[in-house]
Amino acid sequence: MSTKINSLLEEIKSLTLLEAAELVKQMETTFGIDASAVATAAPAVQVETKKEEKTEFALVLSQVPADKKINVLKVVRTITGLGLKEAKELVDSVPKTLKEGLSASEAEQLKTQLTEAGAQVELK
């Protein structure tokens, strides 16, 4: 910066609040500007939004091929603790939610068991 600008800056720094307000008024009238419009036009602050990571998952049985129904039925009984009749009704009426509120690792483990048995499974 030039010495002229540096000296002006130092002079402005030394002003009291009343003197600075008077300077602003004088600049507004001299240059025909409105300092309040400049003060309110502050740059927009960008807020960084973090995508929430899911902590709870629901295990949904979406499809069971007819030839894999018995294997899937065994796994469903193991996972849910249902009796044979209830598990069969559940498998026959897909899509159905098997479990909710599962952790990510538990949900993935159960999904793997069901897909290995032949079912199509979704995590929601």
From Swiss-Prot:
Coiled coil: none annotated. Keywords: Chloroplast, Plastid, Ribonucleoprotein, Ribosomal protein. Gene3D superfamilies: 3.30.1390.10, Single helix bin. It is found in: Plastid, Chloroplast. The keyword Membrane does not apply. GO terms for biological process: translation. GO terms for cellular component: chloroplast; cytosolic large ribosomal subunit. Its main location: plastid. One of its GO terms (molecular function) is structural constituent of ribosome. Forms part of the ribosomal stalk which helps the ribosome interact with GTP-bound translation factors. Is thus essential for accurate translation. Homodimer. Part of the ribosomal stalk of the 50S ribosomal subunit. Forms a multimeric L10(L12)X complex, where L10 forms an elongated spine to which 2 to 4 L12 dimers bind in a sequential fashion. Binds GTP-bound translation factors. Belongs to the bacterial ribosomal protein bL12 family. This is Large ribosomal subunit protein bL12c. The lineage of its organism: Eukaryota, Rhodophyta, Bangiophyceae, Cyanidiales, Cyanidiaceae.
